[in-house]
Amino acid sequence: MEARIIGLKGCGKTTLVSALAEGRGEGHIATVHVGDPRVRVLSEIFQPKKTTFAEFKVQEVAWPEASARKGEMERYLDALAGGQLYLHVLRAFASAQLGEPAHPEADLDELDREFLLSDLIRIERAFERAKKAPLPDAGKKALARCQEALEAETPLREVDFDDAQLSFVRGYQFLTLTPQLLVANTESEGSDQGDRWEVAALAKPARGRHAVAFPFPDALEVARLSVEEQEEFAAALGLPGPAAEVVAQAAFAQLGLISFLTTGSDEVRAWPVRAGETARDAAGAIHSDIQRGFIRAEVVSYDDFMSHGGNMKACRDAGVLRIEGKDYLVADGDIINFRFNV
């Protein structure tokens, strides 16, 4: 998965990249490791040669300078194409440098409108091109439906497309079609800037988007600590947790992702998949050969595994280690061993 970090100037995008990178970032790009405590526990039990957490990449896309904005805005919007998720950063802290109080709700509305306008322009261009290279009727109807929604100020991610329409529309890389997670950069706890802004203020303008809030500078300080120290210091600073963990969990929720787990002496690993995927689909996340030659899946939930002493034999004897077929719907935290033949 790849995410783009977006937001107006001065909101803290670069600081967020650093906090998410935990020292592993390269400029405005970072790889976020999803700190799943279940993976850590299983790694302690199995003592594998390798432990692999789920991860995703983030890239900051800088907001155009006001002096060059007219010429740069289109390039900025084009740079957002290809992201599977936008981390939309909002400034919710006072800034003497910017010389104005924070207005996160208004900032959210400003960028939302830019995205709506950009998508409308793309649709108009698509219809212009269609005069020379006609679109299929289904394509015309899909674009007309998009145009109708956008003119009503409805982002395309809120439109209930069928599978065929969605496949067609995705080809245009409309910005309002991409899911968003709102990430608010707030005042530190104990700040003398008056009442702290609360993320609940976004409930209405978020329009179904998940939102998290924490002070990015504090999160960056926590990210520089060892994994063992991060939880303790995050709590001491009033943070909901380390930034990478908080953002990753919210991003998974926004995208409808879950993780299943594989274990063994070679590797303990978390595998992200869409909620509702079958065992056979999940096997394909590991390797297409496993999906193609799928026979069965041996499944035990993480909770059942731990309640039976972290012992597979005990799980088998108790009947909580199950044999599932290809149509089994994978649940978050399932520990799965795939049997296959190719």
Residue ranges and their predicted role:
Residues 1-96, 112, 123:
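Conserved G1/Walker A P-loop phosphate-binding module
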Residues 1-17, 21-22, 129-332, 336-342:
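C-terminal-of-GTPase-core extension/linker across diverse P-loop GTPases
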Residues 27, 65-68, 72, 108, ...:
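Residue-level detector of alpha-helix boundaries and kinks
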Residues 33-35, 61-70, 81-135, 139, ...:
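Conserved Switch II/interswitch segment of TRAFAC-class P-loop GTPases
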